[in-house]
């Protein structure tokens, strides 16, 4: 229960990066 917000922000950044890669290959 230390850095939940940090982990959430990191996961969101990863998801955004994946979405950008998908858009590049569409």
Curated annotation (Swiss-Prot):
Superkingdom of origin organism: Bacteria
Predominant subcellular localization, coarse grouping: membrane
Subcellular location: Membrane
Membrane topology: Single-pass membrane protein
More details: Entirely encoded within a small RNA previously known as ryfB.
Protein name listed in UniProt: Small toxic protein ShoB
TM ranges: 7-24
Purpose: Toxic component of a type I toxin-antitoxin (TA) system. May be a toxic protein; overexpression causes cessation of growth and rapid membrane depolarization. Overexpression induces stress-response and a number of membrane protein genes.
Example GO biological process: programmed cell death
Gene name of the encoded protein: shoB
Signal peptide range in chain numbering: none
Induction pattern: In exponential phase. The ohsC RNA (previously known as ryfC) prevents the toxic effects of shoB overproduction, probably by repressing its translation. Expression of the proteinaceous toxin is controlled by antisense sRNA OhsC.
GO cellular component: a single term: membrane
Keyword annotations: Membrane, Toxin-antitoxin system, Transmembrane, Transmembrane helix
